[in-house]
Amino acid sequence: LKDDNAVNSFYKKFIKTTNYKRNTAIIEHSTISLHQIELLTKLFSKPKLKFIDAPVTGGEEGAKKGSLSVMVGGDKLNFNKSKKIISVYSNNCTHIGKLGSGQLAKFTNQILICGILYSISEAFQFSRKNKLDQNKIFNALKNGAASSWQFTNRYPTIVKNKFDFGFSTELMTKDLKYVLQHAKKLDLNLKLTRSVYEKYKKLQSTVYKNYDTSSLVKSLID
């Protein structure tokens, strides 16, 4: 589900209209705020639903291949009961800790991804300005220390100016908003994350709103 509001609306309707069994397991894969986790914990306590927060990473490709990584927060017993279901579409399922820790792990993931994508965008801008052969740059760097999943899978599509796929900048903007909200409570100044967040925010008024997060490069070169 898209954001806190969508998640909240869905589960309020679910509780009112669904004939669920007592102790039904709720596996929530959306990336949501910690405030929303608190609201869901209260919402599920009355009907005695078992709840784990289990955001994912791996993108469209991972979902299709069944190779998503899942970060789980919640009771260990609930995690163990849910793991068999999660293993159908995931090849890496990790219990992080108490409820909400799944979201914190996903926030950490998004901080890393936005920083890597910003570096890739600057590297592309630099190599292009120097009129380097982009295919040769990719082949030279893909197996070196500068490589990553994002570089291997997104640099070639950036070179081709192809962005109409993948995890949208709209969703990344939402995720980074939640990251920065929580960081503020901890008195953390995430300078690079905030800078990238502002660039993604500007893309929301463009066609790139629904395009892959790698279209961040457009905020540097267009």
Positions of predicted regions on the chain:
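Proline-centered loop/turn at the N-terminus of a beta-strand
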Residues: 25, 50, 69, 189-191
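Short, solvent-exposed beta-strand edge segments and adjacent coil->beta transition regions
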Residues: 24, 65-69, 155
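Short glycine-enriched loops at secondary-structure junctions
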Residues: 3-4, 57-58, 143-147
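Rossmann-fold dinucleotide-binding core
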Residues: 31-114
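Helical "substrate-binding/catalytic lid" subdomain
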Residues: 101-220
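Rossmann-fold NAD(P) dinucleotide-binding segment
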Residues: 3-51
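Short clusters of hydrophobic/aromatic residues that line enzyme substrate/ligand-binding pockets
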Residues: 7, 93-96, 151, 158
